[in-house]
Amino acid sequence: MRQEKPKRHGREDDEPPEPAPAGRARDTTVGDDTDELLDEIDGVLEENAVEFVRSYIQKGGE
C-alpha cells in the first residue's frame, strides 16, 4: 500500500524558502554570548576545577 505525502500549503514544492535576513544578526549575537559564557566557565575550571565539580554533587540524596 502506497502512502501519499501530505501537501504543504502556502508555497510550491519547487520554490525555496525565503531567507530570514534578521535571523543572521541574531545568530551572531547568540554565538558571541555563548563564546563569552564558555570562556568564563573555562576560567573557573582552570582556577578550581575540584570545587566546581563538588558544587554539582548531590548530598544526602537531594
Swiss-Prot record:
InterPro entries: Ubiquitin-like_Pup (IPR008515). Pathway: Protein degradation; proteasomal Pup-dependent pathway. The keyword Cytoplasm does not apply. Residues 21-56 are annotated as: ARC ATPase binding. There is a cross-link at residue 62 (Isoglutamyl lysine isopeptide (Glu-Lys) (interchain with K-? in acceptor proteins)). GO terms for molecular function: proteasome binding; protein tag activity. The keyword Magnesium does not apply. Keywords: Isopeptide bond, Ubl conjugation pathway. Residues 1-34 are annotated as: Disordered. One of its GO terms (biological process) is modification-dependent protein catabolic process. Protein modifier that is covalently attached to lysine residues of substrate proteins, thereby targeting them for proteasomal degradation. The tagging system is termed pupylation. HAMAP family: Pup. Strongly interacts with the proteasome-associated ATPase ARC through a hydrophobic interface; the interacting region of Pup lies in its C-terminal half. There is one Pup binding site per ARC hexamer ring. Belongs to the prokaryotic ubiquitin-like protein family. The N-terminal unstructured half of Pup provides a signal required to initiate unfolding and degradation by the proteasome but is not needed for pupylation, while the C-terminal helical half of Pup interacts with ARC to target proteins to the proteasome. This is Prokaryotic ubiquitin-like protein Pup 2. The gene is pup2.
